[in-house]
Structures are given as structure tokens and as C-alpha cells.
Amino acid sequence: MAKLSKRQKLIREKVDSTRAYSVDEAVALLAELGQNVKFKESVDVAVNLGVDARKSDQVVRSSTVLPHGTGKTVRVAVFTQGANAEKATAAGADVVGMDDLADEVKKGNMDFDVVIATPDAMRVVGQLGQILGPRGLMPNPKVGTVTADVETAVKNAKAGQVRYRTDKNGIIHAPLGNVEFSAQNIKENLEALVADLKKAKPASSKGVYLKKITISSTMGPGLTIDQGTLSI
């Protein structure tokens, strides 16, 4: 039997897998368990939803602007032209273009994290589906990345908007910040996400919708959150 590392021993000692934690308790515990990690760990959430992800009408796909962002610098590319190109640049977009930007994407030059497109640009972006799709970069109106309001879309992306959809098990995964965030900021980010998830509940979903909420750090364990401690 393999020997447990010091970190694994500490997790076994400190984490009670039979209980649910408040966000304050969970953030404090993740910070304690990550004291010897050599990089800034992210804090992420997994939300188990009461949906059947095999049914197209129960797939939950949306986006949330986290009030305190994710703690990461987000690079934004915008496919548009004319006055909208000027608006996108003024709003803080890192790259703006049309056919010229498409050519860069085809060459593999994709130094950006989010792609936004105006509806008229989709004739160009549509040809890039096989490149952008597998990377999770394909613009989609359901998450606000295909829009005529590029100014708001760019500002939201820069402010820490997270995009998500249920995986095959009906689970949503999203970042909430990092271990240097205060517990209050993590909590408010989580509450904003959960509020939007509730709005996105499919009409055909029956029974308990928010089945389980778990937060974790990059190298840490998953801690179940007591939903009664959230303002949702």
C-alpha cells in the first residue's frame, strides 16, 4: 500500500467528509491545507443539479458576472467591424478584427481567453468552429458572447464573467476566485452564480434542483457547502 504524503495525511486529519461546511469554514480550511503549495491556488465550485443532462431541454447553459471577478486577467478577442470595432477597443478588448483575426486563428495564434462576436460577424466565425469549439471559445448567444452590444460583453468578460454548461452528469463547474480572496468575496461570488443557476432551471426539471454544492482548491479536497448558510 502506497504511503500517504504529508498533505494527504493532513487532509485526512482535518476534513470531515460526513458534514457540510459554511463558506467561511471551507475557505479557511482550504487555505490551511494549501499553506505549503508553491503557487496561488484557484477556488472552484461544482454544483450537482437535478437535471437529466441526456435530454436537450434539461441542459443548463448560461453565464454569470461574478461581483468580485475570478482573480485572473482575461484576454478578449472580438469579431466585429466599423463602429462596433471602435466600441470594443474602447471597452478594453485585446484583439479586434474580422477576416484578419480569422486568419490569425487559423494559424493557431489564439492568445485570448474569450471570443465575442456581433451577429454580422458569425459568417466569418462560423468557419472557425472546428478550431474554437474544442477550446470552448466558440461564441454563443446563450452565454452572451454573440451580441450587438459588444461594449457590455467586453466589460463583462473583463470583469470576471464565467460561462458554464452542465456536463454529462448534470454538474456545473466554475471558478470562484483564488485562496487569497476573502471568505465573504467567495461567498458573494457563489451566491451570484447560484442565483443565476436558479433562474436557468429547466421547466422540465423535477424534484430537488440544487442537489449538492462543493468547493475545492486546485490541489485541495472537495468540501460540501451547507446551502442553509447561503443567501439564496
UniProtKB/Swiss-Prot annotation:
The keyword NAD does not apply. One of its GO terms (cellular component) is cytosolic large ribosomal subunit. InterPro entries: Ribosom_uL1_bac-type (IPR005878), Ribosomal_uL1 (IPR002143), Ribosomal_uL1-like (IPR023674), Ribosomal_uL1/biogenesis (IPR028364), Ribosomal_uL1_3-a/b-sand (IPR016095), Ribosomal_uL1_CS (IPR023673). The gene is rplA. Pfam families: Ribosomal_L1. Gene3D superfamilies: 3.30.190.20, 3.40.50.790. The keyword Ribosomal protein applies. This is Large ribosomal subunit protein uL1. It comes from Marinobacter nauticus (strain ATCC 700491 / DSM 11845 / VT8) (Marinobacter aquaeolei). Belongs to the universal ribosomal protein uL1 family. Keywords: Repressor, Ribonucleoprotein, Ribosomal protein, RNA-binding, rRNA-binding, Translation regulation, tRNA-binding. Binds directly to 23S rRNA. The L1 stalk is quite mobile in the ribosome, and is involved in E site tRNA release.
